[in-house]
UniProtKB/Swiss-Prot annotation:
Encoding gene per record: purA
UniProt organism field: Caulobacter sp. (strain K31)
Residue positions of the active site: D13 (proton acceptor), H41 (proton donor)
Protein's UniProt name: Adenylosuccinate synthetase
Entry keywords, A to Z: Cytoplasm, GTP-binding, Ligase, Magnesium, Metal-binding, Nucleotide-binding, Purine biosynthesis
Record Gene3D superfamilies: Adenylosuccinate Synthetase, subunit A, domain 1, Adenylosuccinate Synthetase, subunit A, domain 2, Adenylosuccinate Synthetase, subunit A, domain 3
The EC number(s) this enzyme carries: 6.3.4.4
CDD domains given in the database record: AdSS
Length: 428
């Protein structure tokens, strides 16, 4: 049996939540390894809707769930999410949820900074304003407050002072009032007992699980095109979202992260600012937005929609080392007479088959499309490949050819069971 790493292969919102939930039935442990509570996902289980942003999807299945050291954790949001899920009948105990004791915390001052910067900037990034970026800055700057620090109040006080010395200068430059260190200390001490109940060295637990032969599912957030190194910089998130981060963000060696499953929509969406060559602002774009219900779980922002971009996904396949993909929302294409797939870009007098790193070229890129015949038959709820009409099958096969990876799973509705298994990722 192989472990499985799940990553988004586009700009996020590909349907990772449903696929991870579906795979959780086959896993023993589910691990979040990067990001924060800026990437929400919706799970539909037995008609009940669960909306998660920080908790691993495995909690809904009652599977051991781990928030790894690569995640930045807002302790107040964590407890709120735990309480909300508990109200839906899922008790989140320390036996079910483990929080890496070396994970860094998101504090109120991080949110202040995030929102003030976005408001003051002439170049909007489209941040969620939840403090994720500033929290990662403090982590890299070696001044972050970590989960383990909550267990040592006396040592925490000077760490807060050092942190505020840095943030004070930033806040003054943005016209924000000074942060209150004593108030922050009291806030942290108030939540410390509940947070610390879940904390332990996650890497040790995962190492033992791996050696015991337990199946581990690594759950990525957002998508490869939002990766701080490989995405459409600077319109990216503040962490590495690619499969390689599964190792660093969990404390497990690269050989343990196993089969890489990329999650891919049958079309393309993006939230916030940044280049998007295949974007549509016509009736087809409205169809994708309306039928696909393309609104952000966390922010409520409408997602920008466009045709499937094989150039971007092929690049994601290479960067992530993707073995196979889960193709989601195929049913959203039902009823479209003609489908288009972006197979290259025209930039000035050049034709390229990859996304250039420079923002000028990214913005100038014009899509080169290949057209395919659509279908009128419904694919919604299909649970077998033979249930798909001929044109839908042709579309899936052409996507495989263009991205250089096979389709391992096919999703035909938000319901967990409306999933066609073509190859079990846990079989490697």
């Amino acid at each position: 049996m192989a472990n499985v790493t799940v990553v988004g292969a586009q700009w996020g919102d590909e349907g990772k939540g449903k696929i991870v939930d579906w795979l959780s039935n086959r896993a023993d442990v589910v691990v979040r390894f990067q990001g924060g509570h800026n990437a929400g996902h919706t799970l539909v289980v037995d008609g009940k809707v669960y909306k998660l942003a920080l908790l691993p999807s495995g909690v809904v299945q009652g599977k051991l769930s781990v928030i790894g050291n690569g995640v930045v954790v807002d302790p107040w949001h964590l407890l709120t999410e735990i309480d909300k899920i508990a109200e839906q009948g899922v008790a989140i105990t320390p036996e079910l949820l483990v929080l890496a004791d070396n994970a860094c915390l998101i504090l109120p001052l991080h949110k202040d900074l995030d929102q003030a910067r976005e408001a003051a900037s002439t170049q909007k990034i489209g941040t969620t304003g939840r403090g994720i970026g500033p929290a990662y800055e403090d982590k890299v700057g070696r001044r972050a407050i970590r989960v383990a620090d909550l267990a040592d109040p006396e040592a925490l006080k000077p760490k807060i002072e050092r942190l505020l010395a840095h943030h004070g200068a930033l806040r003054r430059g943005l016209g924000l009032p000074e942060a209150d260190g004593a108030a922050l200390f009291d806030q942290l001490m108030e939540v410390a007992p509940r947070v610390l109940a879940y904390a332990q060295p996650a890497w040790r637990l995962l190492d033992k699980a791996y050696k015991d032969g337990r199946k581990i599912l690594f759950e990525g957030a957002q998508g490869a095109l939002l990766d701080v190194d490989h995405g459409t910089y600077p319109f990216v998130t503040s962490s590495n979202t690619v499969a390689g981060q599964a190792s660093a963000g969990s404390g497990m060696g690269p050989s343990a992260t196993g089969y890489v499953l990329g999650i891919v929509k049958a079309y393309t969406t993006r939230v916030g600012e940044g280049p998007f060559a295949a974007e549509l602002d016509d009736e087809v774009g409205k169809h994708l937005s309306t039928v696909g219900r393309e609104v952000g779980v966390n922010t409520g922002r409408a997602r920008r929609c466009g045709w499937f971009d094989a150039v971007l996904v092929r690049q994601s396949v290479a960067i992530n080392g993707i073995h196979g993909v889960a193709l989601t929302k195929l049913d959203v294409l039902d009823g479209l007479k003609t489908l288009k797939i972006c197979v290259g870009y025209r930039i000035g007098d050049k034709v390229v088959d990859y996304l250039p790193a420079g923002m000028r070229d990214q913005r100038a890129a014009e899509p080169i499309y290949e057209e395919m015949e659509g279908w009128s038959e419904s694919t919604a709820g299909a649970r077998s490949f033979k249930d798909l009409n001929a044109n839908a099958v042709k579309y899936v096969r052409r996507v495989e050819e263009l991205i250089g990876a096979p389709v391992a799973l096919l999703s035909t509705s938000p319901e967990r069971d409306d999933t066609i298994l073509m190859r079990d990722p846990f079989q490697g």
